Amino acid sequence: MPLIADLHLHSRFSRATSRDLDFPSLHRAALEKGITILGTGDVTHPEWMKEIETSLDPAEEGLFRLRPELAGAAEEGLPGACGGEVRFVLQVEISNIYKKDGKGRKNHNLVFLPSLEAARRFTDRLATIGNLASDGRPILGLDARD
């Protein structure tokens, strides 16, 4: 079975994103496009994490699926050719802006987490460094190596 993945997503809690982004619409769009694995995006944002916890169920190790009652409604009216399984992997993009050796540095890192518990631990650690609730894509003064 071929795997087609989009692993760099954001939630509606990130700047310059659709206010309509939710897990049922992501699930439906993935089916329409033949995508089998989607990143959740913005796992460190507290409001989005609540939606992750209420919208997704564990599937295979490190992957999640849309809850059946949400999936049924999201799939309504799709052509039969759009069938298949969609999985989600817990993911966040961290924007790092910092100085090193007297020079300004900017980079973005995609972080993938294997479980809700790992995501909570990661979020708790980052919360000591910056404000995670202000944007789904946290901007931290942190060297990527740290």
Protein language model regions, located:
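Gly/serine-rich nucleotide phosphate-binding loop at the start of the catalytic core
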Residues: 1, 21-25
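Extended substrate/RNA-proximal surfaces in nucleic-acid metabolism proteins
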Residues: 2, 50-146
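Histidine-centered catalytic micro-motifs
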Residues: 4-13, 43
